[in-house]
Amino acid sequence: CFWQLEDYLYSNESDRVCLVFGLRRTGKTTMLRQAIARMSREDLSRTVYIKARRSDTMAMMNRDLKKLFDAGFRYVFIDEVTLMRDFIDSAALFSDVFAAMGMKIILSGTDSLGFWLAMDQELYDRAKPIHTTFIPYREYSRLLGIDSIDEYIRYGGTLRAGELAFDDEDVNAQDASFRDDESTRRYIDTAICKNIQHSLACYEAGGHFRHLYSLYEAGELTSAINRIIEDMNHRFLISVLTDDFQSHDLRLTASNLRKERDPEKRTEILDNIDTEAVTQRLMELLDIRNKEEQSIGITDTHIREIKEYLSALELIVNCPIETADPGAKSVEHILFTQPGMRYCQAQALVHSLMKDETFSALSELEKTQTAGRILEEVRGRMLEDIVLLETMKSADREHRVFKLQFAVGEFDMVIYNEKENCCEIFEIKHSGKQVPAQYRHLLDQEKCDKTEQRFGPIRGRYVLYRGEDVTLENGVHYRNVERYLNDLPELNIAPAQEAGIEQTGPVL
């Protein structure tokens, strides 16, 4: 991203602006300051950094930029430009006037949707976009020097952990969250939908809500977006939005604790919890209204439009689920580029559990075990999404990356080489131990036969986990998931046997 910014700064382009946008704490301001710090003394003397405020207008910006141009300034960095309510509808001022006059204009902000809308209208074909929302594990590890997948899950692809002050009204109140420049950066991960609402409210005087206006007017747009984000399957189906809201994390963990193999960890704690009260508490934390409070029905059109805006924010990517049936259509599988939102919701769930009377009456050990198990379940599912997403982004056009489901069971990930007609199959486990149950699907002859029928010979069977690399006698390769993610930029998936070397990982 940084080199793209410098390329723009020192190019001969004279009619385009550079847009640096993404969610909060993804390095936008740091990138701008780094670019300024690397300037020559001469260029620095002609550079200005402006921090926009909510009270600023494009008329004020126009006046100031004229003065700066007359004073000899040619490099203008404007941070948080999307805070100005009339930015989207007047953004062409930057490209058509000041960039055309020879100024290099760099605009940055957290409202990604605002930039997306501006690029479709005012800045169409006149902007060089630089996206910062998605920070892959390898980049996070390089920048912060922390080689821990759990830390990455906690930070969720940003350079800051999720908001934990769930009971702090000053933090959660909308007016407090945006009361100044710094508090704007504190808006809660679980309320990311406010990004959408702010941009749409500013665009064409709020006239572009389309079919979502009824939800927005009734105060239920936040509910609809959050239901999509929380759903464990990440599917945009009407049933997800209209069913009574329940915590999928809580239901799954209760089931797993009942069937825990270790008798010391087996417990029915969650069966005795007042789940209705817990769910109500969680909904309050996430600003979600239940079905009984929902006055506006959710339609397919609502779902499509919400999905479109979440995609524009770069929050979601579709990684389809394939099935063993060659004639069946792939199933939509939405991955979030910011896993921290999911983890933040799980933390909110644990926080609400601690307030439940039944749970509070238990021993500290029981509370710790239960809370830890909930977060372990969440981290496991998030790890699968992270590996799928980053592998898919690293693969070239000759390779497809997807999850493969069968009538019973699934492969967490398949990498299919369309050119060579061969594949590699993976299980992804949030564990540091090697357990036969982890790779049982990889050795299931029926599943493997069905896979090879559709996707050619299986050239490798892998378990990505948090332990050390090792190859078992049965041919299953265990590989450290953190090293796997760090190696992804050099993805060169090809049959290792053809290279005449021993295969210890997906020839990467």
Model feature map: region roles:
Residues L117-E268:
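Interdomain motor-coupling "hinge/lid" segment immediately C-terminal to the ATP-binding subdomain
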Residues K28-T29:
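Conserved lysine of the Walker
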Residues T391, F411-P436, R461:
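Conserved catalytic cores of phosphodiester-cleaving nucleases, focusing on short active-site segments
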Residues F69-A91:
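Conserved P-loop NTPase "ATPase switch" module shared by AAA+ and STAND
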Residues V97-M119:
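Sensor-1/coupling segment of RecA-like P-loop NTPase cores
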Residues I196-F411:
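Accessory nucleic acid-recognition modules appended to NTPase machines
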Residues C1-L9:
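N-terminal pre-Walker A segment at the start of P-loop NTPase domains
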Residues R459-L508:
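Domain-level recognition of nuclease-like catalytic cores that cleave nucleotide substrates
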